[in-house]
Design a protein with these regions (language model features):
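Amide-donor transfer/coupling interface in amidating biosynthetic enzymes
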Residues: 17-20, 56, 60-201
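Short, histidine-centered active-site or binding-site loop motifs used for metal coordination
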Residues: 1-2, 119
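Cysteine-nucleophile active-site neighborhood
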Residues: 2-65
């Protein structure tokens, strides 16, 4: 599905119906990986681009220090790790053209990572902070078993980049922070008790 044009995805109409519904029924939305790309395209017209090979592994990121006052970044170190597993990406230049969006974190290798609307109603995360320790391992071994896939070993994941060594879990504290911050500051504290008060955002 990731390599398909959005409009060629079988459930695109159903998905866009939900995205449109969220404008008036959801105070803050959090989109991950392909869903982040799809939502960026639907709400802002940001296209995705096919990479030359699968981006997979655990990559070093840095926060945008000028945006550290954003509550989603509370407790973040200036540098942190996060997993990625995808064949497509979005362009930093395309996002920077949109006044309503802020790039909050990115990676030299993996590109843009956290994008947020200025009002906090939408967050777009291009990686997978939710991944379990062994998720990338399972994906890699699945791909190895498929002769139609050119498998890529996850970078910075196995000790010394050796599949026979233990997995290095470097993203857990970041994962807890990003989800806890979003739920606390943008869902629990700001969603109005009367949902009829939600305005189109």
């Amino acid at each position: 599905v990731e390599k398909l044009d959005f409009h060629d995805v079988d459930y695109w109409d159903e998905l866009t119906t939900l995205l449109e519904w969220s404008k008036t029924h959801v105070f803050s939305s959090f989109f991950i990986c392909w869903a982040a790309q799809a939502a960026l395209y639907y709400f802002y017209g940001v296209s995705k681009y096919l990479l030359s090979h699968k981006l997979t592994g655990v990559y070093l990121h840095h926060t945008n220090v000028e945006k550290m006052q954003r509550k989603i970044l509370r407790g973040f170190d200036y540098q942190f790790y996060a997993p990625h597993s995808r064949y497509t990406s979005v362009s930093k230049e395309d996002i920077e053209k949109i006044d309503d969006l802020d790039i909050l974190a990115e990676s030299k290798e993996a590109g843009v990572y956290i994008v947020a609307s200025k009002d906090g109603s939408r967050f777009f995360v291009t990686g997978h902070p939710e991944y379990d320790p062994d998720t990338l391992d399972k994906e890699y071994k699945r791909d190895l078993a498929n002769p139609d896939i050119i498998s890529e070993m996850p970078k910075n994941y196995y000790l010394n980049d050796d599949i026979h060594n233990e997995i290095q879990v470097k993203w857990r504290s970041h994962a807890y922070l990003i989800f806890a911050n979003w739920l606390n500051y943008y869902v629990y504290q700001q969603t109005p008790y009367n949902l009829d008060e939600l305005k189109e955002r």
